[in-house]
């Protein structure tokens, strides 16, 4: 019940704004309803996966993804190829049902791991004020990751699909396939970097909390940073080899698929493979900055990524379409360098960062979101009292 109280504001606000867009977008009633349904499911799924990754239930997430993929493909094939349903509506309905299955699966897992609690469902708003830089880090990272796609929709290669729906198929398709080349880094961060680095990280910080001697702290720091440097170097090398392999082999494989790849799309693909590879390694460094609670450095790197990618993409619109994608490549390279230099500067004097930069007196931040949480808690308490009074009157 409390899960839905948290999701309710997101669903109401998000669906209201997206619903207004759909009303003027030119989509049919059925298409609009399916898009709105899918949008609402994605809100629940995104929040659910955030909690499930926090408790590291990767098997549950994998099973929900596999079940959703199987249902989407199976139902899509049945509706479109066997029953002859319209392709757009049939595939959109299939995807919606697949994500619906994922939503139900994730909610069941959430209720299994997080049973009913007496705590207020609005407590998380207090943490928003404390960790607001994380929200801006995520926002800037996503802006840098997707702004180049949106900007090219308005360029010479952009097409109007229908109403307010735009795209750039010659660029979007290579971008989607190139993005898959960074899966090795995403997986490597979980199974290698976190597995090998986190124990050293935990031992180092436990010495500060448990009264470790200076010699042990220095030794633990050297071991931790050595493991970190090794894992980051291996991550970069794995992504380099993966990117080189994909660029070398994908040209032949992509020509075998009915995707309509031409020389221009192959050029976009190669450029974006390098760009996404740099982004993947830079994002790994960004996550390590968050490990060390360097929220300022993380926001700085993410902001540079968002601003540079957008600016370089706008600049590339002035040149020939063959140069599209280099704006994202330049922004990703700058993001990687800024994040790496920040991590090097931060870890160069780590004991001072851990001890000297902490506030002497504990600070309690009560800003907008905290006050909003207190207000909602009071409203819940007021509603609960009114409910109890009504129940008492009915019993009398």
Task: Identify the residue ranges that each predicted region occupies.
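Small-residue-rich segments of transmembrane alpha-helices in multi-pass membrane proteins
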Residues: 12, 63-77, 125-133, 303-310, ...
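Helix-loop junctions and terminal segments of transmembrane helices
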Residues: 1, 184-215
């Amino acid at each position: 019940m409390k899960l839905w109280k948290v999701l309710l504001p997101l669903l109401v606000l998000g669906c209201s704004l997206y619903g207004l867009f759909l009303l003027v977008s030119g989509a049919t009633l059925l298409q609009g309803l399916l898009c709105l349904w899918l949008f609402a499911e994605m809100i629940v799924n995104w929040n659910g996966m955030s909690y499930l990754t926090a408790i590291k239930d990767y098997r549950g997430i994998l099973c929900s993804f596999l079940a959703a993929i199987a249902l989407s493909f199976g139902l899509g094939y049945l509706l479109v190829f066997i029953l002859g349903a319209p392709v757009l509506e049939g595939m959109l309905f299939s995807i919606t049902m697949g994500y619906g299955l994922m939503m139900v699966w994730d909610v069941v897992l959430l209720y299994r791991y997080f049973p009913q609690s007496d705590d207020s469902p609005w407590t998380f708003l207090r943490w928003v004020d404390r960790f607001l830089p994380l929200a801006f880090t995520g926002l800037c990272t996503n802006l840098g990751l997707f702004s180049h796609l949106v900007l090219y929709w308005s360029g010479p290669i952009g097409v109007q699909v229908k109403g307010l729906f735009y795209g750039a198929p010659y660029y979007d398709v290579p971008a989607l396939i190139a993005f898959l080349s960074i899966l090795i880094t995403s997986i490597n961060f979980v199974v290698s970097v976190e597995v090998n680095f986190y124990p050293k990280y935990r031992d180092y910080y436990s010495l500060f909390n448990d009264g470790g001697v200076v010699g042990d702290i220095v030794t633990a720091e050297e071991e931790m940073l050595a493991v970190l440097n090794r894992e980051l170097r291996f991550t970069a090398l794995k992504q380099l080899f993966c990117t080189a392999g994909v660029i070398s082999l994908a040209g032949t494989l992509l020509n075998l698929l009915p995707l309509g790849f031409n020389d221009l799309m192959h050029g976009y693909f190669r450029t974006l493979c390098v760009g996404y590879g740099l982004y993947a390694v830079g994002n790994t460094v960004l996550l390590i900055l968050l490990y060390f609670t360097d929220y300022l450095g993380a926001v700085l790197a993410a902001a540079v990524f968002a601003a540079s990618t957008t600016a370089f993409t706008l600049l590339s619109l002035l040149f020939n379409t063959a140069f599209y994608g280099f704006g994202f490549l330049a922004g990703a390279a700058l993001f990687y360098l800024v994040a790496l230099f920040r991590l090097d500067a931060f870890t160069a004097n780590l004991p001072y960062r851990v001890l000297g930069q902490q506030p002497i007196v504990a600070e309690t931040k009560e800003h907008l979101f905290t006050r909003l949480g207190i207000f909602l808690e009071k409203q819940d308490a007021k509603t609960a009292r009114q409910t109890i009074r009504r129940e008492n009157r009915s019993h009398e």
